[in-house]
Amino acid sequence: MQLTVWTYEGPPHVGAMRVATGMEGLHYVLHAPQGDTYADLLFTMIERRNKRPPVTYTTFAARDLGKDTAELFMKAARDAYERFKPQAMIVGASCTGSLIQDDPGGLAKSLGFPIPVVAIDLPAYQRKENWGAAETLYQLVRALAGPKAPAPGAKRPERAPGVRPTCNLLGPTALGFRHRDDITEITGLLGKLGIDVNVVAPMGATPADIARLGDADFNVVMYPEIAGQAASWLHRIFHQPFTKTVPIGVSATRDFIKEVAQLAGVDATAVLEAASTRLPWYSHSVDSTYLTNKRVFIFGDATHAIAAARIASEELGFKVVGLGSYSREFGRELREAAKHYDVEPLITDDYLEVEAKVAELHPELVLGTQMERHIAKRLGVPCAVISAPVHVQDFPARYAPQMGFEGANVIFDTWVHPLMMGLEEHLLTMFKDDFEFKDGAMPSHLGTGHAAPVAEVIAESAPPAVAATAPEIVSVANAAASAAVWAPEAEKELQKIPFFVRGKARRNTERFANENGVATITVETLYDAKAHFAR
């Protein structure tokens, strides 16, 4: 067990809650102590849902452990059925509740409810949130759609002439990163291809909708971490093919359109020719040339991290210097992607390892989760959020998908704006000592009048740590290896170098000083090092 102040994923029962909360007519009875009810806040506070999750907790306390906790669970299940009248019920235990070993599935089925009751057995101490969501969706699909499965060996009937092809959208859940808007975007894209959506699951689906998943011609796997297992089962039992491409980014969206068109047997030429997105033109415009070869570090769930790496490299001209994920189940896919960009993959759920890697690589932009936002802020690096887990500001009121052509526009704005702000910050820092721009200067539009006198503080000689006015990304290894000391005037001169290359300039200067036996780095040393490495 590891004590930490941050986790990328919650326990697996939180994943089950995400599925249940996204659906309609489904209720989740969770054998859990009172302390586990914190999970409600994830949906009401962070996602800003206007109603509580459809979850009933047994909320046993320490005094109940000497009694019949099984009876406590059965009473909670009966009360939930009578109060909410769900179409189906799932039952399980939280990480703490599983230690009691009361068998919620067997207890609930013994109550004889006239609705489907699906037991969700989640290994709380071996698996995490996304796996829990995937397992819950898989068990629901098996239990509700399974009775309508064709006989073994039976072939899938051909679609009648003139009938529009249909598909299911699999994977969107509550608390997902832009899942709500991705559904709208992909539904519209499929509509342009002449394809109807049969069911979106689990988001917005009822148990009756899950039961008719087999009616569709194929499945669109929007988020493989959640829908991959269910899609594989539907392919095996109902002979429904499913998509492999996740349409995040312009190139991936075009590939997705071609793949879907092939599965549905439709012509995608008109849709591809009419595709409208501003990202390609914006990224090729003169104003965007400064994006070329920007060093970017990417971390998130596997789906969004791999997609972000492709966009960064192929569509924006960034240089991917780091790629990682907390999704251990998709380690193989991430390693293959990392090999493509010639970087070492980082597969971990320890945010301290991620922070150390960011500090080591000195990126100019970090793309990650809410934690990477904090890490980048501490290190003084621009950051954009690309993946769950996220905080409340990443559930915007506006339409902001990540998928499709409009999603590409949103991604361009989201990723580039932090760099724009960084450029402005650099200009302000560069000219802050100029006689026209210092704090005591009169505004230029007010003529040549005299400004109010301002007390001017003369900088005294100070240690390098005090002289520095902007956060530096300096790894522990580099700091330990450097024996040279920075003179105050050299530190001041270093601040005139743009912040997004300042770390590299510092490292090169210290390396030059160490190789040439320079004990104190002066302004002359700084420029000698610049000339040396410019050859």
Swiss-Prot record:
One of its GO terms (biological process) is light-independent bacteriochlorophyll biosynthetic process. Pathway: Porphyrin-containing compound metabolism; bacteriochlorophyll biosynthesis (light-independent). The active site is at D287. Substrate binds at G422, L423. Gene3D superfamilies: 1.20.89.20, Nitrogenase molybdenum iron protein domain, Proto-chlorophyllide reductase 57 kD subunit B. It holds the Pfam family PCP_red. Component of the dark-operative protochlorophyllide reductase (DPOR) that uses Mg-ATP and reduced ferredoxin to reduce ring D of protochlorophyllide (Pchlide) to form chlorophyllide a (Chlide). This reaction is light-independent. The NB-protein (BchN-BchB) is the catalytic component of the complex. This is Light-independent protochlorophyllide reductase subunit B.
